């Protein structure tokens, strides 16, 4: 009968198994996009994934949108405005933007692509056409840095398009809304001091530049103007190719021209291009251009080694299998050989350096072991604890190895086999005993097989071996009975029986021997035939 300790341990394991089963049913699996889930959880302000899942379930089951407190916009104008923003982004970047989360304003949503480009859209407000805001002029330095090539291609379109482009670039450089001012003439020169100050500000601003960020504000709007010619095609540098100068970069002028096109929508809001400090995604470095001043870009070339190193971030690590080497122990008198450096170091530490031994606590035993796990297995032999029970006959055992060997009795499995005679058994002890028998009788194997050379202890074993292993060769040989000749018996004198009958036995080359028994009163029939 099992002890109370074993029953308590069994009940504890059963309760643990049931608890794991219940937890596995209600466990939340978020899929393989773990980084995106963690980023969304942090942006929404949750500390646990379960809270994020509860929030998403509430959002799904709720009748209205939590983020949109105001009335929903018209289905046509609101969605068309979102399509316009997405189209504006697609002219600069080929990646598809996705919803990142709520923005800073009430009801504002932020969309972001994999390259870090963001733009905000507020569905609660429908843009309406308004007057054109007049803003501060763009400095000559900024013009040269951002729109030099685009302006050269658009000079034929007239002064009106150029003034609109310069006002939008001014908003980009200042990053804040500026008060309304009147635009000066196009060819007006500025003071040298102002140019130097603005050059310094531009270098500070562009040195920390990161991918484009689009944000929309429904306060301003754009007038209906003729569509300018398309902007030059953005060239994506290939691997090992030097990125082009900023003159060939996609210009904000072309983006703003597409916003104000009458075909898409009466541009209800202005799209403000800002330089955000969002870090670039290393895997999408080929989709973004580095924004640098002309002087610094000419002096410093992109570092290809840094791009290769950072491109490996986030990829799954592939572990290489350790090489199999034969490493013998270098201590004198020890011939152990290991295939792993870790095993060799462990062997040296406990067998030679420390020579730590674990003694059995039983006073009558006195055995010691080099490893603690071996001592634990040995201590079970002294106790009456039998935690391993056979499922066929309910017999209990102290160790799992004994249970495995016992279970083979019920299954009939005999995995161990003698390599000499093919004897099979269930446990290693039986095989060792059987091999010892072969070692003792090795000198007595005097009868070899004439076909394969295998030796046996008895001639009967040779005959049994030939009939089992070489049945096709036996018919060509003489039968075993002919190998031993029958003894010849010659009796020249006749044996007289007590009754007077004579018994004569003759043997010749003929295998059939004749034996005659004659009595005195009965004549021999063979003598009668001869006469």
Curated annotation (Swiss-Prot):
InterPro entries: Znf_C2H2_sf, Znf_C2H2_type, ZnFinger_BTB_dom_contain. Residues 186-206 have a biased composition (Acidic residues). Residues 155-178 have a biased composition (Basic and acidic residues). Disulfide bonds: none annotated. Residues 290-303, 483-499 have a biased composition (Polar residues). The modification Phosphoserine is found at residues 231, 469. One of its GO terms (molecular function) is RNA polymerase II cis-regulatory region sequence-specific DNA binding. It holds the Pfam family zf-C2H2. Residues 502-520 have a biased composition (Low complexity). It is found in: Nucleus. GO terms for biological process: regulation of gluconeogenesis. PROSITE patterns: ZINC_FINGER_C2H2_1 (PS00028), ZINC_FINGER_C2H2_2 (PS50157). Residues 155-249, 287-307, 474-531 are annotated as: Disordered. A zinc finger (C2H2-type) spans 327-352, 358-382, 388-410, 416-438, 447-470. Phosphorylation at Ser-469 results in loss of DNA-binding activity. GO terms for cellular component: nucleolus; nucleoplasm. Keywords: DNA-binding, Metal-binding, Nucleus, Phosphoprotein, Repeat, Transcription, Transcription regulation, Zinc, Zinc-finger. Belongs to the krueppel C2H2-type zinc-finger protein family. May act as an transcriptional repressor for PCK1 gene expression, in turn may participate in the hepatic gluconeogenesis regulation through the activated AMPK signaling pathway. This is Zinc finger protein 692. The lineage of its organism: Eukaryota, Metazoa, Chordata, Craniata, Vertebrata. The gene is Znf692.
């Amino acid at each position: 009968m099992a002890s109370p300790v074993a029953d308590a341990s069994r009940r504890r394991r059963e309760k643990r198994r049931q608890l794991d089963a219940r937890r596995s049913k209600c466990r939340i699996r978020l899929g393989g996009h773990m980084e995106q889930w963690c980023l969304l959880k942090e942006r929404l302000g949750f500390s646990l994934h379960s809270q994020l899942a509860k929030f998403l379930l509430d959002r799904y089951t709720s009748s209205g949108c939590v983020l949109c407190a105001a009335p929903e916009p018209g289905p046509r104008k609101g969605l068309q405005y979102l399509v316009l923003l997405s189209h504006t982004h697609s002219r600069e970047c080929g990646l598809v933007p996705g919803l990142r989360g709520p923005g800073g304003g009430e009801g504002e949503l932020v969309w972001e692509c994999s390259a870090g480009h963001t733009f905000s859209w507020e569905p609660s407000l429908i843009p309406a056409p308004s007057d054109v805001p007049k803003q501060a002029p763009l400095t000559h330095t900024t013009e040269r840095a951002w729109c030099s090539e685009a302006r050269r291609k658009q000079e034929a379109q007239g002064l009106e398009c150029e003034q609109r482009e310069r006002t939008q670039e001014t908003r980009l450089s200042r990053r804040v809304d500026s008060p309304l001012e009147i635009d000066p003439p196009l060819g007006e020169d500025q003071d040298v001091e102002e140019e130097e100050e603005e050059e310094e500000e531009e270098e500070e601003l562009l040195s920390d530049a990161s991918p484009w960020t689009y944000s929309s504000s429904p306060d301003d709007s754009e007038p209906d103007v003729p569509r300018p010619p398309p902007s030059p095609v953005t060239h994506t540098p290939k691997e090992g190719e030097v990125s082009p100068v900023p003159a060939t970069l996609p210009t904000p002028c072309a983006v703003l021209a597409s916003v104000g096109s009458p075909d898409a929508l009466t541009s209800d809001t202005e799209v403000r291009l800002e330089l955000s400090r969002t870090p670039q995604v290393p895997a999408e470095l080929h989709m973004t251009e580095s924004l640098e001043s002309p002087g610094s870009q000419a002096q410093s070339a992109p570092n290809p080694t840094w791009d290769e190193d950072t491109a490996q971030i986030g990829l799954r690590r592939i572990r290489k299998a350790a090489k199999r080497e034969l490493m013998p122990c270098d201590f004198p008198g020890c011939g152990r050989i290991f295939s792993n450096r870790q095993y060799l170091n462990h062997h040296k530490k406990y067998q030679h350096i420390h020579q730590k031994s674990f003694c059995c606590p039983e006073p009558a035993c006195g055995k010691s072991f080099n490893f603690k796990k071996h001592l634990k297995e040995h201590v079970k032999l002294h106790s009456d604890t039998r935690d391993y029970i056979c499922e066929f006959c309910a017999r209990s055992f102290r160790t799992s190895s004994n249970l495995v060997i016992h279970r083979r009795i019920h299954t009939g499995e005999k995995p161990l086999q003698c390599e000499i005679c093919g004897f099979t058994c269930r446990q290693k002890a039986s095989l060792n005993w059987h091999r010892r028998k072969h070692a003792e009788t090795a000198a007595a194997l005097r009868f070899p097989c004439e076909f394969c050379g295998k030796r046996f202890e008895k001639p009967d074993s040779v005959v049994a071996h030939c009939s089992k292993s070489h049945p096709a060769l036996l018919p060509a040989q003489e039968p075993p009975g002919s190998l031993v000749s029958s003894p010849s018996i010659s009796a020249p004198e006749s044996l007289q029986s007590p009754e007077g009958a004579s018994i004569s036995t003759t043997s010749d080359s003929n295998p059939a021997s004749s034996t005659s028994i004659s009595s005195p009163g009965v004549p021999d029939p063979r003598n009668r035939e001869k006469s």
